[in-house]
Design a protein with these regions (language model features):
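Short alpha-helical transmembrane segments in multi-pass integral membrane proteins
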Residues: 1-24, 81-146, 194-249, 306-371, ...
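Transmembrane helical elements of multi-pass membrane transporters/channels
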Residues: 22-41, 142, 153, 176, ...
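Transmembrane alpha-helix boundary and packing residues in multipass membrane permease domains
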Residues: 27, 31, 42-43, 60, ...
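Generic alpha-helical transmembrane segments of integral inner-membrane proteins
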Residues: 28, 32, 36, 40, ...
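Helix-terminus/linker motif at the lipid-water interface of multi-pass membrane proteins
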Residues: 32, 36-54, 123-130, 186-197, ...
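Interfacial/gating helices of multi-pass transporter permease domains
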Residues: 45-64, 130-135, 199-201, 241-248, ...
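Small-residue-rich hydrophobic transmembrane alpha-helices
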Residues: 53-116, 150-169, 267, 280-344, ...
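Short runs within selected transmembrane alpha-helices of multi-pass transporters and secretion channels
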Residues: 74, 143-162, 169-177, 202-217, ...
């Protein structure tokens, strides 16, 4: 009896790691490609000038915030879709996709309008430097086109990932990323007879690649049997699913937007401490993203796998899977820190910044060798484990208090009241992830996050009512 039980547990463990690697590898490749594109942007702009790097880095905060909005909407959609996919309810998945598209398209259109008509106002929030405002405004005006495409593709790709089609999602992103790098080089350096457009060229390249990605999504949708990109899904009405979506998405959206806006406040603080700090931070962000790809891929894959298990009603199994996922994340976080440390000399060798920015760059990179671990563990639990069971409120409360009550006020106080040196301000800002660890681990051990959030006979009940 004991031998059989051991074999059963061993098989379950093997099955978990097999499924995790099947989901994680494409996501890692996708994240690496994304980091590679961002790296290419910064490396190419490095040859244009420090002002171009700084301006694009500040203007890109809007893309980051908007991405977090899409991520929040995609989270609500993918959490529901992952669990309904576990029940093989495709009709519910279509309705959920339609709800997410309604919100993403409306938000994209609003931000695009502001980028078209008031880009200077958007830049003045981050800097008072006239040169940076001018460069960033040209960049934002073109990026408005990107926002319109992005809102549709991010929702569809989130739905594909939620049903386990991570390879297709990876392939579509790969197409956009490779095209982005080629077009960046073309418009920044004036290749193939194109004009040298600098920062504006980066925006044109991004907009073009996102448009191609949208077209590719339409083609994939046409070939798909069930999970399609269909705007008519926006007109599917389900009061129950809408309530469930709002219950999950609003806290997730609020969490992601609150966190991303607060994180952008770090750029506001650094932006008013000088262009050297901004330029150094733009390179550090790229390196940190490279070091974090394994961690965030595990969190994304874990959300899909745990969601499917919970949708089938096996809550105890989901807790075992969550424990294994956390162990994988800790290992990945340690590896990420080593990667950042290992490539620091290479970054220092090829960065073309002035002496002040190079000094900041060196020590900011060292700080991020440990910062990755804090970010990895919190992402795995808050954005992975907890959300897989529909627990999105905890992250909203936890991150809002951590960022807006602790980190952002501390950063402003350190920079503008105590007037501490730039590196001390940066160090204090990078304590944000570790401050919330006790709270996060306590919530994890309680196990209340493990829930089956699907409903039986969903559309039949609505027809009856």
């Amino acid at each position: 009896m004991g031998v059989n039980m051991t074999n059963t547990l061993s098989t379950g463990k093997d099955d978990f790691y097999r499924q995790m690697f099947k989901l994680t590898i494409p996501i890692i490749i996708q994240n690496l490609l994304s980091a590679a594109v961002n790296s290419a942007d910064v490396i190419m702009l490095n040859y244009v000038g420090q002002s171009a790097i700084s301006a694009v880095s500040l203007a890109a905060n809007y893309s980051y915030i908007l991405f977090m909005v899409y991520y929040g909407l995609g989270t609500g959609a993918s959490l529901l879709c992952a669990q309904y996919y576990g029940k093989n309810n495709i009709q519910a998945i279509h309705a959920i996709e339609g709800i997410a598209l309604r919100f993403s398209i409306a938000i994209s259109a609003l931000v695009a309008l502001v980028a078209f008509f008031a880009p200077q106002l958007m830049m003045k929030i981050f800097t008072s430097d006239p040169e940076l405002i001018s460069i960033g405004s040209s960049y934002l005006r073109v990026m408005g086109i990107t926002y319109l495409c992005w809102g549709v593709t991010e929702v569809y790709l989130a739905i594909l990932r939620s049903v386990g089609r991570v390879t297709i999602s990876m392939a579509l992103n790969m197409l956009a990323f490779v095209l982005n790098i080629i077009l960046n080089a073309t418009f920044i350096f004036g290749l193939f007879g194109a004009p040298k457009l600098g920062a504006t060229g980066v925006a044109i390249a991004t907009a073009s690649s996102r448009l191609v990605e949208l077209v590719a999504c339409v083609i994939v949708s046409f070939m798909s049997k069930n999970v399609k990109l269909n705007l008519t899904y926006m007109f599917i009405r389900s009061k129950v699913l809408f309530r469930d979506f709002m219950k999950l998405s609003l806290p997730a959206l609020g969490n992601d937007v609150s966190w991303s806006v607060a994180f952008s406040m770090y750029s506001v603080i650094l932006g008013h401490l000088g262009t050297d700090a901004v330029a150094a931070n733009s390179l550090v962000t790229v390196v940190r993203n490279i070091g974090s790809v394994f961690c965030f891929a595990i969190a994304s894959a874990g959300t899909i796998l745990l969601g499917n298990v919970m949708g089938k009603g096996d809550l105890e199994k989901s807790k075992v899977y969550a424990s294994r996922m956390l162990k994988m994340t800790v290992i990945a976080g340690a590896i990420g820190g080593v990667i950042v440390f290992a490539i620091t000399p290479l970054v220092m060798r090829f960065a073309s910044l002035n002496d002040g920015a190079m000094y900041y760059l060196k020590y900011m990179l060292l700080i991020n060798t440990y910062y990755i671990m804090g970010s990895a563990v919190n992402s795995a639990l808050i954005a992975g484990v907890f959300r897989a069971g529909g627990d999105t409120k905890f992250g909203l409360i936890c991150d809002t208090i951590d960022m807006w009550v602790y980190a952002v006020p501390l950063g402003f106080f350190a920079a503008f009241v105590l007037k501490l040196p730039v590196l001390w301000v940066y160090f204090l800002l990078c304590t944000d992830e570790f401050v919330k660890w006790p709270w996060v681990f306590h919530h994890y051990r309680q196990g209340k996050w493990a829930q089956n959030i699907t409903r039986e006979d969903l559309f039949e009940q609505e027809k009856a009512s």
